[in-house]
Amino acid sequence: MSHLSRTLPIKRAAHVYLVRGEELLLVEERMDDGSIFYGLPGGKAHPGESLADAAVRQVAVETGLTVTDLRFISLLEGEMLRGTRNECYANFGRFTADYHGDLDPTDPEVVGVKWVPFAQVEALIRYGPPPECEERNPLIWVPTRDFLRGEARAYYPI
């Protein structure tokens, strides 16, 4: 089958850059092997749910915070994980927002939430889940690096 005749599942997700001074909020999730993965607050969109609505919902569950004044930063899209059982077409929105509330995650996969200095974010996000997971793809983290440097683009092909 040629790549032109394949149908890939579509994975839609949204993540939010929450900033406090020179710190970025990251969530800590425990992987199946017991290791800790640091990621941006956010996650998968439900069928029919906009990326903006998914961002608001997921941030509330993963952090306990309420986001307001959601602002679009970037869209990442393209084929991912080619040749693996998780192969998909990804459509990921990145936003920033104002927020209020207390850090109190209710997502059972989240074991912690922490403010991380910008200078330390890149070191933490280099380590993640197994290679078959999209978060391991280094292109997923290029927009975060660019955002922290004040160089975010609106579109990132992956």
Where are these regions (language model features)?
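Residue-level preference for beta-strand/loop junctions
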Residues: 10, 36, 89-91
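Unchanged
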Residues: 45-68, 78-131
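Nudix hydrolase/Nudix homology domain
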Residues: 33-38, 108-158
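Conserved N-terminal beta-strand and adjoining loop/helix that marks the start
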Residues: 1-25, 44
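Active-site beta-strand termini and strand-to-loop segments that position acidic
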Residues: 18-21, 29, 96-98
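Conserved Nudix-box catalytic region and its N-terminal flanking loop in Nudix hydrolases
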Residues: 23-61
